Amino acid sequence: MTNRYTTLFANLEKRNEGAFIPFVTIGDPNKALSFEILDTLVSSGADALELGIPFSDPLADGPTIQEANIRALESGITPKDCFDILTKIRAKYPHIPIGLLLYANLVYANGIENFYQKCLDAGVDSILIADVPAHESKEFRDIAKKVGIAQIFIAPPDASESTLKQISELGSGYTYLLSRVGVTGTETAANMPVEDVLAKLREYNAPKPVLGFGISKPEQVQQAIKAGAAGAISGSATVKIIQNNISNKQKMLNELTYFVKEMKAATLN
């Protein structure tokens, strides 16, 4: 089902826009509110969703997303609940690309093929396994291909040419380009320039590069698009809005709406 990404990027290109993709953890802060949050993100103008399934040991995540995982797990969320929420959001929004960003342990625990099939059945378009680099991804890649899900790879800013070439050849859907090395979070702002990496990815005809890590302000989205990225992903900044408004649902949803609208507006060239 990579067609949703292909269609999205083609439509955005026609309109001279970039993609704004928020990331949140499914089930944060609880099951009922999680669906409303996803619904708000899409209805406010998100071009695609990147979502986490709560896991007790999120290696690449900074404190903000780790806390989101803890909140979701403490509310009693299960992988089955996550798939229910995904199915519901897919039914409401048939065209939006939905990606999962998770860790290998979670996939192994469910059996790789079984997990990918469940994802497909719930309407998921892509899977990015944060702790599996492209050169170690064969068992996941093969099943992704068989099932019909796009396998996304991370392109680090300090990647060698051969790594970038491999990511370009093996990936599908989009390429997750890191704006810097380290763990996620807005504590450390994204540091451009990534023009050189973007030029290489273009040369190798990689899936569309989307910039992530430390993206929290509209001007960073603007910079990313200007540098040649097809879009920007914002995780910690989105999750922080949830964290800061746990006891005030309406304020949370209002702030998420404002944030998405502002970030999306920055993708318009």
From Swiss-Prot:
One Pfam family per UniProt: Trp_syntA
Leading EC class: lyase
Pathway stated in the Swiss-Prot or TrEMBL entry: Amino-acid biosynthesis; L-tryptophan biosynthesis; L-tryptophan from chorismate: step 5/5
Keywords recorded for this protein, A-Z: Amino-acid biosynthesis, Aromatic amino acid biosynthesis, Lyase, Tryptophan biosynthesis
UniProt keyword annotation of Glycosyltransferase present: no
Catalytic activity: (1S,2R)-1-C-(indol-3-yl)glycerol 3-phosphate + L-serine = D-glyceraldehyde 3-phosphate + L-tryptophan + H2O
SUPFAM superfamilies: Ribulose-phoshate binding barrel
Superkingdom of origin organism: Bacteria
Active site: residue positions: E50, D61
Presence of the UniProt keyword Transmembrane helix in the record: no
GO cellular component: cytosol
GO molecular function: tryptophan synthase activity
Gene3D superfamilies: Aldolase class I
EC number: 4.2.1.20
NCBIfam families: trpA
Quaternary context: Tetramer of two alpha and two beta chains.
PANTHER family assigned: TRYPTOPHAN SYNTHASE ALPHA CHAIN, CHLOROPLASTIC (PTHR43406:SF1), TRYPTOPHAN SYNTHASE, ALPHA CHAIN (PTHR43406)
HAMAP family reported for this sequence: Trp_synth_alpha
Main function: The alpha subunit is responsible for the aldol cleavage of indoleglycerol phosphate to indole and glyceraldehyde 3-phosphate.
Family: Belongs to the TrpA family.
Protein name as it appears in the record: Tryptophan synthase alpha chain
Organism listed in the record: Francisella tularensis subsp. mediasiatica (strain FSC147)
